From Swiss-Prot:
The active site is at D150, Y405. The chain crosses the membrane at residues 7-27. GO terms for biological process: carbohydrate metabolic process; viral budding from plasma membrane. This is Neuraminidase. It comes from Influenza A virus (strain A/Chicken/Weybridge H7N7). The gene is NA. It comes from the Viruses. Its main location: virion. Residues 36-87 are annotated as: Hypervariable stalk region. It catalyses: Hydrolysis of alpha-(2->3)-, alpha-(2->6)-, alpha-(2->8)- glycosidic linkages of terminal sialic acid residues in oligosaccharides, glycoproteins, glycolipids, colominic acid and synthetic substrates. One of its GO terms (cellular component) is host cell plasma membrane. Its cofactor is Ca(2+). Residues 1-6 are intravirion.
Amino acid sequence: MNPNQKLFALSGVAIALSVLNLLIGISNVGLNVSLHLKGEGVKQENNLTCTTITQNNTTVVENTYVNNTTIINKGTNLKAPNYLLLNKSLCSVEGWVVIAKDNAIRFGESEQIIVTREPYVSCDPSGCKMYALHQGTTIRNKHSNGTIHDRTTFRGLISTPLGTPPTVSNSDFICVGWSSTSCHDGVGRMTICIQGNNDNATATVYYNRRLTTTIKTWAKNILRTQESECVCYNGTCAVVMTDGPASSQAYTKIMYFHKGLIIKEEPLRGSARHIEECSCYGHDQKVSCVCRDNWQGANRPIIEIDMSTLEHTSRCVCTGVLTDTSRPGDKPNGDCSNPITGSPGAPGVKGFGFLNGDNTWLGRTISPRSRSGFEMLKIPNAETDPNSRIIERQEIVDNSNWSGYSGSFIDCWDEANECYNPCFYVELIRGRPEEAKYVWWTSNSLIALCGSPVSVGSGSFPDGAQIQYFS
């Protein structure tokens, strides 16, 4: 075969291959169009299904490989989030188990751990996080000197993964302030921070990270809020705020927000005399708050909020088992309407309880005089029966170790339970004032626990840092 004949033969083969490739491409286009139209014709009542078609050099259709074809990926859109409805009761609890412990002070001996106080835990549909008010410094930083002070211009709210000590790299800044609360309504998160001078403070309100409104002091004496999570029902979030003296009559409001905007506010009603730092939880379309009386009572005041009517009432926990600190000895009879006084009495500490009839649990420091140790007490009908007594006790932190604030939280999005499992945290304060011999700073670690439906073992879970290592 001469060169010209070879050339014509090769050209003919090339043309034939090109035509074949073109025919395959046309068939692929037809297949893609038919699949696309078929996908559009499917109607679903709840979730929308979309088909994404990507054309590459090889097509895979039902595991059959064809030249130059398409990969078909299907994805399903999730349902839109819904508002939390608080339609469950509290679970029955037989004991408490630790779900997180961040050991922040132990890590802080060598790591750059942020100085915090007033920590709490709050959950949303994706999980739970720790929130805390930082002091604008780390433990080993010289600026940690003087962080015993509660209200400075350097403070702000941060969040970190629950169980992880707060560092600059893992902390998420939320807002500026020295008092805070935060809660999720099922669709978005509302946060309140309070900033400014003691006699002229301002509360800033955020919804999904955007500033929505501000609230100016109404009594010009340290406007303050819960220092733990608020609670939402059907898009409305209830928050307890106080302004006025810490050791005499103050002015408390229950405020209701929708997407960060005030829709109603009520002055405190009922027999409670003094309200600060409420620990609130939701159940049965209600919000129950166990608070701090910094003025007179060692029995804790409580607020009950009906979220369907947006109205509340207040009184005291009825039992004679006292749970504030400082406190006198337990009484044989309690009082549902009046503060129980005695020496030592004031000033108090943030605390909590779960008021659930026969399955009522109250938390308190073990020491009646100082913030040391922590225990959980099962006291059936403590919220209604002045003669109720302790039937079960579980030690959380032994009395030779420091504790601090404590508060309640609930993961309302835990679909594994047909009820709301009560949870709480304990702040483990280290440094000044109790350990001023060794350090100039004040900070904390945190431990979080949740209820168990069966009885549990025993154990103490203190902060555990050797404070002399910081000298």
